[in-house]
Amino acid sequence: MKYSLDTNIFIDGFRNEEAQAEVLAFLNRALPFTYLSAVVMQELCAGGRSADVVRGLERGVFGPFERRRRVFAPSSAAFVESGRVVSVIAASEGWQLFDERPSFLNDALIAASCREQGITLITRDGDFKRLATFVKGFRYALPWPTPTANIQ
């Protein structure tokens, strides 16, 4: 099984020592099966707020995945599928797409690209439950203690 950590898992690890220990323990067990989404990389850089923080991400987080060639990016088909999914959900729920849920676009893109790669997303973000009903074959799991016990 292949895994990818969602942005919220990394952020939790940056903000909290206990969460950081959980992330590191997971990576120690599952690193040979773990990939990094280019969309997650973009979100982490956008939240970095300084060149020093972004350089730290590049060295400490992105670099190990890049050296192992374990970074994946969405295909053009994933972009189209995620756009269609967001359009359907936005219309059915009556939201102004970019005003009310801008991060949902990236979530849909992550879901579609994980599905393409056969990767299970490890996340705490509840939006992925809804996305899983629209992105057929997409799998996600809650992070701890063992993600494989929570695969949806």
PLM features: residue spans?
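Short, well-structured N-terminal submotif of metal-dependent ribonuclease cores
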Residues: 1-37, 46-63, 147-150
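Generic structural signal for small/hydrophobic residues in well-ordered secondary structure
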Residues: 6-7, 44, 82, 114
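A generic structural signal for short hydrophobic patches within well-formed alpha-helices
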Residues: 10, 41-44, 128-129
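A general structural signal for well-ordered alpha-helical segments in protein cores
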Residues: 41, 54, 58, 79-82, ...
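Short, hinge-like loop/turn segments at secondary-structure boundaries
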Residues: 51-55, 89-90, 138-142
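Short acidic-hydrophobic, aromatic-tinged amphipathic segments that line or gate anion-handling sites
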Residues: 69-75, 140-145
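Active-site neighborhoods of divalent-metal-dependent phosphate/nucleic-acid chemistry enzymes
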Residues: 70-124
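Acidic, PIN/NYN-like endoribonuclease modules and their adjacent C-terminal/linker elements
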Residues: 111-152
